[in-house]
């Protein structure tokens, strides 16, 4: 599980939405602007229930968003958007909406569907989601991504290629899916501030050196798709451990890039416009700079690796 500082693990809050509070055009919504962005979105989105896998009776809840293409015959690749430890929040659905705006079919599965007692479109309180997420197994994480990808690729408007992007816990899930190979069509992974599968994990009190040492080269050797990782230098654990990931992936000659944005914090995409009461001006500026640079780079990376049918 991804680790955060005490300041960053605090439950996110949202300001009241209004039509003028929609954030920066061409970038995903922040935590403060997601609700307004979703209400104003011209794209078709809906809740769907899908089976976890073949023969599975229980359902996985997911939010799917389709791009508004001027060409009715155009098909789009799929991007699975994996949420943070806070569950499938309004903010994550806002991210999915921007992914669709950039030309992909975006699907965000609720990885807590089983542990919360069944599929539901009701957003969980952050503290509830944080407690429940510890009950989601690694196998469930990868299976849910595969189930969401398969469902989206079955849609008439989809190509047969998909990528997975994730944040915090979802970033680690993106790594785990890459290590385990995914399903047919898996083409790329983009973990934001989430570490790869480790040799048994590390406790929250572990030092940065211990976290870095726990990253398994044997696990990373199994990665077959291009990976783009992004983090922030002020993330005391994940940002500090990124050089170890970079070194291993380079030694394995994997198709990989890692960017550790100077001054940005854990969760910088969500926190891109946090109020000054929570962030100082330098952090606020660094988070927005990281978002403005990282998002278009990610979109270009996804398009490059999922071009064609």
Question: Residue ranges of each PLM-predicted region?
Answer:
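Gly/Ser-rich "nucleophile elbow"/oxyanion-hole loop immediately N-terminal to the catalytic nucleophile
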Residues: 73-76, 122-167, 305-308
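Active-site glycine-rich loops that stabilize anionic/oxyanionic intermediates
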Residues: 76, 82-87, 233
């Amino acid at each position: 599980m991804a680790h955060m500082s005490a300041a960053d693990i605090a439950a996110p809050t949202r300001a009241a939405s209004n039509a003028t509070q929609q954030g920066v055009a061409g970038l995903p919504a922040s935590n403060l602007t997601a609700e307004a962005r979703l209400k104003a979105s011209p794209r078709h989105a809906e809740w769907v229930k899908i089976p976890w896998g073949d023969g599975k009776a229980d359902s996985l809840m997911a939010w799917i968003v389709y791009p508004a293409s001027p060409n009715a015959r155009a098909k789009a690749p799929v991007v699975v958007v994996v949420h943070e430890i806070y569950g499938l929040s309004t903010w994550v659905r806002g991210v999915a909406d921007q992914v669709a705006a950039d030309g992909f079919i975006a699907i965000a599965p609720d990885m807590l569907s089983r542990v919360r007692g069944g599929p539901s479109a009701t957003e969980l309180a952050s503290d509830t989601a944080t407690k429940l997420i510890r009950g989601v197994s690694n196998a469930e994480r990868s299976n849910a991504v595969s189930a969401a990808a398969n469902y989206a690729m079955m849609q008439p408007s989809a190509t047969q290629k998909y990528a997975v992007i994730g944040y915090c816990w979802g970033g680690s899930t993106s790594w785990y899916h890459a290590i385990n190979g995914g399903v047919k069509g898996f083409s790329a992974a983009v973990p934001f501030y989430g570490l790869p599968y480790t040799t048994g994990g590390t406790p929250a009190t572990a030092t940065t050196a211990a976290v870095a040492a726990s990253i398994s080269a044997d696990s990373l050797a199994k990665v077959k798709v291009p990976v783009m990782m992004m983090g922030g230098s002020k993330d005391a654990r994940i940002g500090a451990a990124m050089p170890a990931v970079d070194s291993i992936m380079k030694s394995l000659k994997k198709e990989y890039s890692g960017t550790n944005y100077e001054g940005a914090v854990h969760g910088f995409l969500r926190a891109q416009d946090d109020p000054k009461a929570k962030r100082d001006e330098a952090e606020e500026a660094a988070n927005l700079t990281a978002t403005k640079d990282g998002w278009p780079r990610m979109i270009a990376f996804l398009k490059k690796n999922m071009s064609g049918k």
